[in-house]
C-alpha cells in the first residue's frame, strides 16, 4: 500500500525539518513547499492526501493559493489544514468558504496535529471543527 502524502506549505524551514521527522515517524510520506508557487508546482507532479497550509507565505499568500486550488477540479477535494499564527476568527470567512478541514493556531502540539492529519485523510476534509 502506498504511503499517504502530507504536504507542508510553509516558509519556516525549521518547522519543516521538525514536522518531516514527526510525520515520517507516523508512516506518512512528507513533502515540503516553501511558498505557494512551489505548492502549485508540486501539485502538478503528485497529488497529496492532505495539505498543511500557512496563510502568511512569500510571493503568493495562503488565501490566494487556496482559492486557486479550489478552482481546479484536480485539487478541489484535497483536505487542507490551516497552520497559522493568526487567530481563527481572523480567517473565519476563508475557513467556511474554502472548506477547510481544520484550523490549527501556531504554536501547536504535534500530537494534536497528527490527530487532525489522520482525521482529514480519513474523512477527506468533510468534517470541520
Regions found by a protein language model. Give the residues of each.
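The feature encodes the CheY-like receiver
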Residues: 16, 58, 76, 88
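Charged docking surfaces used in two-component/phosphorelay signaling
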Residues: 17-25
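Residue-level signal for the "D+5" position in two-component response regulator receiver
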Residues: 32, 57-60
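Active-site beta3 strand of CheY-like receiver
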Residues: 46-52, 57
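Alpha4 helix (beta4-alpha4-beta5 surface) of REC/receiver domains from two-component response regulators
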Residues: 64, 86-104, 111, 115-118
Amino acid at each position: 500500500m502506498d504511503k499517504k502524502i502530507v504536504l507542508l506549505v510553509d516558509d519556516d524551514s525549521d518547522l519543516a525539518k521538525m514536522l518531516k521527522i514527526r510525520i515520517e515517524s507516523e508512516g506518512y510520506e512528507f513533502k515540503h513547499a516553501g511558498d505557494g508557487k512551489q505548492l502549485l508546482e508540486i501539485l502538478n507532479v503528485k497529488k497529496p492526501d492532505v495539505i498543511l497550509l500557512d496563510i502568511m507565505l512569500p510571493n503568493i499568500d495562503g488565501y490566494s493559493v487556496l482559492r486557486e486550488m479550489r478552482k481546479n477540479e484536480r485539487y478541489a477535494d484535497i483536505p487542507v489544514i490551516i497552520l497559522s499564527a493568526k487567530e481563527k476568527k481572523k480567517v473565519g470567512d476563508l475557513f467556511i468558504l474554502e472548506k477547510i478541514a481544520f484550523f490549527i493556531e501556531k504554536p501547536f502540539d504535534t500530537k494534536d496535529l497528527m490527530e487532525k492529519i489522520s482525521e482529514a485523510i480519513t474523512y477527506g476534509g468533510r468534517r470541520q471543527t
